[in-house]
């Protein structure tokens, strides 16, 4: 949800500012997570000179280096943790050598609030950009529903700035005229006048998520961008059906994972589900964590490797612990 919403915020806003812009949504299984060399080369071959990442890129040091070697301009917008290595002098942070890196979790970043999701990073970038162009922020504020949607679904802390965004975003959804978002609300049979954070986090969000999990997130992006009601209704119905399918797969996988977890008393549970669809590993990990109150990593078979996703508890910094054994992984982030 966060990636789709941040991509949509950037796409819609940059287009409004007159940029020639398109959105590429990596296929979760074929392309993996985030930007990669194949996508960069494809963009370069098509004559594209600038790449702007959203909700990813902070861990893409080599990929950014490759884009720069081709003479491309690359801007990273992300909210994930900055990778680092431990040295005798302390932590050495590994920041991609992009033309600009916008991430409030950088050590030297003075932005006061550190719990933004990717869509809010995109929203703040566009807000600053329109201000520098001397353009009214009215159009930017119309994007608050998407920032609110991502904020709730990415489960960031609902404090300070995030609480305000969700509060005002919910109010704006009730009066939203966007065809795509309204089509999804209708497909889910939600009364717009009574919409709240539950509907965002447990009804609308999962439908957007299901697109990227079982098909391609491009379908969700197409829905949000659609201006034709008939086409939007078809896309929304398709996303709703995908989510229903995802629910059934998740229930089955969760049952298997809990059965496996019963046989182990480890402080951190690592569960291998051979036939699990890799896109729902994180959801299953979250369900097992809730049941066992332990950090959980769910692994499954992927092309040429084993792939997984983890969910932790408040007392355990999973990303920090993974960094201690990073040589065991081909790639990871958080």
Enumerate the language-model features and the residues they cover.
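Active-site cavity-forming subdomains of large catalytic enzyme subunits
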Residues: 44-115, 119, 123-132, 142, ...
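Hydrophobic helix-and-loop "lid/oligomerization" segment in the mid-to-C-terminal part
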Residues: 1-50, 70-71, 88-91, 97, ...
